[in-house]
Amino acid sequence: TTPMDSCVLDENGDFSLQAPSPQYPDFYRLRVGNRSLLLAVDSIEAIVVSTTLDSLPYTLSIDGSDASLTIAQLRATARTATREQLREQAQLTIVQNPRSLAAYYAVFLKQGGEYIWDLYNPADRRMYQAVVTSFHTWMPDYERSKALYAQVSSALKAEREIQQQIAMRQLI
C-alpha cells in the first residue's frame, strides 16, 4: 500500500484529500487510527463520507460512490448476517453490475476469515465468471482484470484435469 496523503482534521473533524484520477477504478483505504474504510474510486468521483470515529467503518453515509456504499453495506452485513444472507446480498451486487468494484469486492468477500465463494465450486465460480467477463471485456489491460482472469482460468484448468483423470479411470 502506498500512502496517498495525510491530513489534519479541523476543529469540526472535517478534512479533504485529493489525488490524480486513476486510469482504472480502484480501491483506496481511508485509515483513522486502527479503523479503516474501503472506498471504490472511479476517475471522475468526488466522494463525501460522513461518520464518527466510533462508528467507522460500519455506520456512515457515503455520497458520490455507489460502489463504496455497497462495499460498506457488504462489510456491515458480513458482521451480523448468516453466511447464506451474505451470499444472497453479494450475489445481488454481482448480478446487478458485474463491472463495478463492488462486484469485484463481493467475489473476494470473507466472513469469519473464510471466503464466501469457492472458486473451485462450479456453482460458486459463476460469480467469479460474471465479474471476470465484465472486467476483461471493458478493462482488459487492468491488473485486477488480468489477475482475476488468471485465477478463473487456473480453476477451470484444474477442473478439466480432474474430469480427465476421472474419465481415464473409468476407461481402465
Predicted features by range, described:
Residues M127-I172:
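N-proximal helix/coil linker or "cap" segments that precede and/or mark the start of modular domains
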Residues R83-I94, R126-W138:
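Amphipathic alpha-helices of TPR/Sel1-like and other helical repeat/solenoid scaffolds
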Residues P98-Y115:
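Amphipathic alpha-helical repeat scaffolds of TPR domains
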Residues L9, A102-A103, V131:
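Generic detector of short, well-ordered, non-transmembrane alpha-helical segments enriched
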Residues T1-N97:
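A non-transmembrane, solvent-exposed segment enriched in polar/low-complexity residues
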Residues Y115-R126:
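Short coil/turn connectors between adjacent alpha-helices in alpha-solenoid helical repeat scaffolds
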Residues Q96, S100-L101, W138, Y142:
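Residues at alpha-helix boundaries and the short loops/turns that link adjacent helices
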